[in-house]
Amino acid sequence: MNTVTLGGTATINDLVSVARFGAKVAFSKEYEERVNHCRAHVDRFSHEGKAIYGLTTGLGDNWKKFIPEKDRETIQRNNIYAHTCAVGEPIAEECTRAMMFVMLCHFGSGHTGIRLETLALIRDMLNAGISPIVPGHGSVGYLTLEGHIGMVMIGEGRATYQGETLDGAEALKRAGLKPVVLSSKEGLILLSGTTSVTAFASLAIYDAQTLSLTADIAGSFTLEVLKGTLMAMDERLMAVRPHPDQINTAANIRAILKDSPMLERYRGHRVQDALSIRCMPQLHGPVKKAVKDAQATLAIELNSSVDNPLIFDEEDGGVVALMGCNADGTYAGMASDNLCIAITDLCKMSNSRIDRLLNSLVSELPAFLNKNADFNNGLMMIQYASAGLQGELRILAHPAVVDNLTTCANQEDYVNMGYNAAKKAYDSMHLAKYILAAELICDGQALDCYEDKRCAKGTQAIYDLLRTKVPEMDNDMPLTPYLEAVAQQIIDRAYIRTVEASVGALKF
């Protein structure tokens, strides 16, 4: 089992390793030292009784209320209670784990003032496999979902552990862990920041990387089985419009289809291909750029201090608590909205290619790739499913961060809505994988419609992997199991690994 050690720069791959693949988490000596150093300042501030938001005062519009030192532990617990109000179906376990990992990254920055023992409990919960039950709706960018994680930490709420859903206290007990008694400022720390936005957006970015490369793979296969031409992928065309991601996409397609016997057999069959094939570099390229832009934003966000207030050492040896708004989620939210647009565009082109594969008027193949038309429908309905998914993606492409409502007695008269953006980005990736799965299934069936099935080395590898889950279809059969199986192969990066083993590394 891999271990991710925190203390340096954390990456999206680190987050996915922990959240999705169960890697363990450890703290470096540097991580522990900076946490303890900052906590000492918070303890001193608490004893001195200075007016510091969330430490000696209430939250939101209650910032005007001073909290006596004797009541601060009670207030921290009450803060968790009050903010635990998300609703609806629970988020996926990998999303909860991603949130907990982000907490460790953000709160361990050395500027929040959280205690090391509180962070250690989050780490130990991750390593033990305790996953708080977190409802998925009702966040403007922070606070409510995070409250449900805090509830389990204090021995309340609900969590899953070893396949069972348990009371939070019982889950901790079975794992040999004890609840934490929150100290000054810690309730606020656990609730504040861009935890959920960063978590969902990071998972979405990882999947968007996977999908954008898989689109190159599926699109290449489609080009080949539709007797296309590589002319539009020529390096000279790319060189005079030198967007790096356009250049890389064309290079991927050329590599996958290198020395294709099928393309050679049909050389000159068409003057040029339809736009959904000819224009892959010009659409897949911008999608990759959008993913890279989001990745750059989230790489910063994952390694940021996002609480309010934040604690800083001063050059003269003093210490200051600065009230600000690093907890705002617009950076990650706007990046997520852009991801939704990008992945919808990617799938728009995939859907056009699916139509060309199934439409005998343009494919020069049997209608709906149906090899036994007397009693069968072929793959007609796979296009309906894909079109429905595209409709959902278009809805999710509407930006979330442009929305606003005033909250908290006008003290928080603007809210970022970053969580809604990040959640729909995560959901969009889930939908998009099925559209690419549909294209790959159609590709495989199209190849089977030829008597001479000799194809490029890259596409042969794709076909062979596809056939481990999806049989050649001579008669109608339920398609859902095959869509699910291929979609899982896609998200597992099986097609990327298989193609790279055959033709070399793809460019992203």
Question: PLM ranges: what are they?
Answer:
Residues 15, 79, 83, 95, ...:
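Short alpha-helical scaffolding segments that buttress acidic/His motifs in well-ordered protein cores
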Residues 53-75, 82-107, 133-156, 164, ...:
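FAD-binding core of FAD-dependent oxidoreductases
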